[in-house]
Every structure is written in C-alpha cells, then in structure tokens.
Amino acid sequence: MWNLEGVIKTITQGTIFEKLTQQRQAELMAIPKTELAESIAALLTRPPAPRIPHGGVLSNLVYAAQYYEVFEAFDLPEQLRVFEPCVGASDPIIIAAEAYSDGQADYTTVNLNRTLREELQGKIGHLETSIHIIDDNAQRVLTHLGTNSVDVVCFHHAINDAIQTAVSEPRGMDTATVDWWPNERQMIEWMAEDFESGVIEKCGKPELMEIIGNAVELTRPGGYLIFDHWSGLVYRDVEWFPWELFCDLVPIARQWIEESNLPVTEIKLPDADPQWWMFLQIEN
C-alpha cells in the first residue's frame, strides 16, 4: 500500500488530481518531476523530514492519496458517508472522499473555530460532494447525526486537537473564536503539563473518549474508524515541544480504547505503521 509510483500517479494525473482546482493543478505540475518524487517519498515517511521542498503544495495531497487507498483497502461503499471530527482547516479527507465517490459522497464535520472554518470553506467550494459543516462541539454530534448513519469516521491528526481543546477551555481560552495557529503552542504546552501531572485522566481523556464513543455509535456495523497522526522532525529539538508525547498519541489513544471495552476490533494494513495509524472496525 502507498507505493510511491502509485501515489505520484494518483496525485498528478489520477483521481486526486482530477478533483483539484486549476490553480492547485498548475502549482502541482510546476514542480520538476525529480523533486516531486523526492518530496512525495519524504511525505510518505513518518515522521516527515524537516523542510521538505514543495511540502506546502504536496502534503495534503499525499494525505488525501493515503486515505483514498485506505478507503479502497476496506472496500467502502461508492457513495461514501463520512464523518470527520476536529477537521480544522484541513481538506485531505474531503478530497479523498470526493475522489473515491466521484463527487457522490456525503461528508459531515463539526467545526467550532470560525477562523479555521472560513479557511476550510475557501478550499472546498468547487467540490461536488455534499458537505455539511456543523457549528457545534464534537462531543454533541449525536444531536445532529443518527446512529449507524456513516460508513467511516476519520480522525485525521485529530487526537491532539480534541485533547488540546479540552485542556484549554477550562483555562479560559475560547477555542471557538481564538486565532488557532498563534495560540496552538500554548494549547500544546498545557496538554503536555496535564499529561505529566496526570490531570489528563480527568480533563482531556474523558473528552476524547466521548468523541470516539460517539463515533462508534454513528458508524454502521462493519464500518471503520481511521486514526492517523504525525509530527515533523523539525519539532524534535524545539525546546518547548513535547516530542515524545506527540509521537505517542496514537498508541495512547489505542490503550485508552482497549481499556474502554468499546465494540471495535483493530485491523492491520500493510505499510501502515501502528505508531502513526490505527484502524478500528465496528463489531456486528
């Protein structure tokens, strides 16, 4: 899975490429072929190297191609029903769903942060997929979507976002209105403090597990929860950044889920490192 040549083809002339705006297509095609291959290979490696050439153009397309292949591996329905909590301004899952279902997917997300929501909307206005952005907290998704109403829930770099929100709100940060990127360092530092002190068991873990529990209830039997995470090597030597914690977020979530007795079974896929990926199938 995620063969370099296959990913390059999907991004530069295949199903992902076809769903991009003309501007993004032009930016992509302007990259020399040798640099393109080297950069995509670097982005397929987790943790990714620092300062990957053309990373700003390629990163989300690589993630979209990876999710597209996961959808194929699980033989998900052509008219895919997707829920993504904590989407922020990130569009890889939406692009992957658009490509997989040829514009016939149904995608729902919950996004309280207004700045990130506006940034996301600016990226996806050209897509044909039915897209619903709910202005609410991810913990309240069951008031908007019914049981067994989706085929897959995608936690794309979402574990940290859910926990960061949970630890920041009690400290007085309004995560719905704050400018996310300039304040994310503070959120991450608070998260690290709470893991180190053990407070995370009372504030952080419960909120994430509620979101995951809701995702299980939303997903039809036989459907999937997909988790991925990464942390770029550029942050490894940054003094304030909790490198080891960020690298362990998927294993930490896996342990919490195992302790929860939720009706899920972990599925392994080739080439998907369990340090950075987790696939859970809803039991019948």
Q: Where are the regions a protein language model picked out?
A:
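Conserved SAM-binding loop of SAM-dependent methyltransferases across substrates and taxa
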Residues: 89-104
